Regions:
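Phosphate-binding/switch region of NTP-binding enzymes
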Residues: 1, 7, 11, 126-179
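Helical mechanochemical/support elements of P-loop NTPase systems and associated helical scaffolds
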Residues: 24-28, 49, 53-56, 78-82, ...
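Conserved nucleotide-binding/hydrolysis micro-motifs of P-loop NTPases
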Residues: 22-26, 75-78, 103-106, 146, ...
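Switch/connector loops and helix/strand junctions flanking conserved nucleotide-binding motifs
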Residues: 24-30, 38-39, 106-111, 155-160
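Cytosolic-facing regulatory segments adjacent to core modules
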Residues: 3-94
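Short glycine/proline- and charge-enriched loop/turn segments
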Residues: 36-40, 113-120, 160-165
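Generic hydrophobic alpha-helical scaffold/packing signal
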Residues: 17, 29, 33, 83-90, ...
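Phosphate-binding/switch loop-helix module in NTP-utilizing enzymes
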Residues: 69-141
């Protein structure tokens, strides 16, 4: 990326997986189109284009269509579901880069952990930490890059020195961050 010229085509496209956990495929596609075309999402949704926006959106759609980009939708997921989707896409598409949106609990994770722990209830921070560990383990096992995110608690608005204490649910997630 060049700040003066924007994205520069290098001719190299790496297989990439995007795992969405809260948004439908249609929402993700619209956001991708908006980002790549630099056209407001509402203009795309309602078809109200100005100047060359429609042409840019069509070009963005072509770029996305020609890209080795794969999207998996996991609205209610377990740790095993996430791992299975990652392994499937490594096997079928040789993905090297994975974006997981985002680290949070789900009913299926709670059920999975409860079964594995013999019914012992774990706190949310422990479960979130386990998910971050699993993602990091997959990076190391398969030699892939995984990026994820998590939410911040309400203290972020007043914090002068952002740190792991602002992570909602589990500041222990920060223990597994590499960047």
């Amino acid at each position: 990326f060049d700040p003066n010229f924007g994205w520069i085509k290098t001719g190299v496209a790496q297989p990439t997986l995007f795992i969405t956990t809260e948004q439908e495929l249609e929402e993700i596609q619209t956001m991708m189109l908006a980002f790549i075309s630099n056209v407001d999402e509402d203009h795309i949704i309602y078809g109200n284009y100005v100047q060359d926006e429609e042409e840019r959106v069509l070009e963005a759609a072509k770029i996305i269509g020609d890209s080795p980009l794969y999207v998996e939708v996991l609205p209610d997921f377990s740790l095993q579901d996430v791992e299975d989707k990652i392994k499937k896409n490594i096997r079928e598409h040789d993905v090297k880069y994975i974006f997981h949106d985002y680290i949070h609990t789900s009913l299926k994770i709670l059920e999975e952990i409860s079964k594995k722990s013999g019914g012992i209830k774990l706190r949310e921070d422990n479960i979130l930490f386990m998910l971050s560990i699993r993602l990091k383990d997959l990076c190391n096992k398969y030699g892939v890059f995984i990026m994820s995110a998590t939410q911040l608690n309400s203290d972020y608005q007043d914090s002068e020195t952002p740190d792991q204490n602002l992570l909602r649910g589990a500041k222990s997630i920060a223990d597994k961050i590499d960047y």
